Amino acid sequence: MRGFGVHSEVGKLRTVMVCRPSLAHQRLTPANCHDLLFDDVLWVHEAQKDHFDFVLKMQERGVEVLELHDLLGQTLANQQARDFLLDRRITPNVLGSQIAEAMRPWLDEMPAAQLAAFMIGGIAISDLPEVKAKSLMLSALPETDFVIPPIPNTLFQRDPSCWIYGGVTCNPMFWPARRAETLIQRAIYKFHPIFLGGDFQIWWGDSDQPFANASMEGGDVMPIGNGTVLIGMGERTTYQAVGQVAQALFRSKAAKRVVGCLMPKSRAAMHLDTVFSFCDRDVVTLFAEVVDQVRCYSMYPKDDDGTFEIHPDNRPMLDVVAEALDLPQLRTVETGGNSYQAEREQWDDGNNVVALEPGVVVAYDRNTYTNTLLRKAGIEVITIRGSELGRGRGGGHCMTCPIWRDPAY
């Protein structure tokens, strides 16, 4: 029987969602990759092989792996789900009224799997021969222009939603280029047979309202256990969102403490999990240069309506986390090598590992210094190739959205 809920960062991982490299990555070019928030273009064939290996290694450890294209295709077989998604993606505000009117009937008749591929991989003018004839505007645009841009960052399933104890948030993303990812997750959680009627709540974010300055991405969110949630506040996650999530969790008595971790804002440390991740119940890997600068603010419930009080904490982040988990201290594995090598390995996601169970993690093979230190600390490190998958700046933690994970304490 499948369950729902993520109750730690290192308990037995039972169900996870991923997204394989596909059409969206085939459409990345040096000219458009930065607009689509990807640092580089991939050798897609090799990235697909490496991602398949990643999935296989999780499955060999008993993890159920759900794939986004498959889930979305199955979801869009439901007419209500199709309407939900297209009503929000194919609009005059997004496309212009003439293009929206020309495209909608074509998309309404499209097979579900093909529609899913286009919703993730984008729709170019060259994909629209039948529709193009009905729109003067489309006829005037270059064949390579996108009417619906690709969303290649779906490779990093950690961010658009995150499971926190017995529920999930649908995250309003910081950059407009990624916000369509959250809409896809909302459709899946609402309409896919796996989730329909499931025993979980959507804590926050399932709304069409503009979120203004409230943005959150799952790479910043860690339900570490013992009723505590860490939420990084750096480049992508804002205090406006953290406060609302804390209130929603406290209102439902789903958490007893939320720790906001104020981080320096930088591309290299865009999320908390790029500089800090759990490997075992008491072992973390971290990039000390950033983690040593983190300032913590603990939020505790005040009343049943979810209101809370905030307590600044002047202790190092590691002490705050250890105390929240009732541990005397955390054992740490810092990014390996000298200062140059450590900075390179952090950039290559050396600290962005995903735990399959206590003491077992998946990491990129290229981070040899950090992986060696993890093994010396007693961690089993399963490696996958990172030469292509890592070009978008994310490792095993970023590429996975745990849906069901056991407690660890």
Swiss-Prot record:
InterPro entries per UniProt: Arg_deiminase
Pathway the protein takes part in: Amino-acid degradation; L-arginine degradation via ADI pathway; carbamoyl phosphate from L-arginine: step 1/2
Instruction: Tell me one GO molecular function of this protein.
Output: arginine deiminase activity
Identify the GO cellular component terms for this protein.
Answer: cytoplasm
Q: Which reaction does it catalyse?
A: L-arginine + H2O = L-citrulline + NH4(+)
What UniProt keywords are attached to this protein's entry? Arginine metabolism, Cytoplasm, Hydrolase
Q: Could you tell me the Gene Ontology terms of the biological process aspect for this record?
A: arginine catabolic process to ornithine; arginine deiminase pathway
Cellular compartments annotated: Cytoplasm
Q: What EC number(s) has UniProt assigned to this enzyme?
A: 3.5.3.6
Please give the chief subcellular localization of this protein: cytoplasm
| Manganese recorded as keyword | no
Active-site residues are 398
Q: Which HAMAP family match?
A: Arg_deiminase
Q: Which family does it belong to?
A: Belongs to the arginine deiminase family.
Q: What is this protein called?
A: Arginine deiminase
What is the source species? Rhizobium etli
Name of the coding gene: arcA
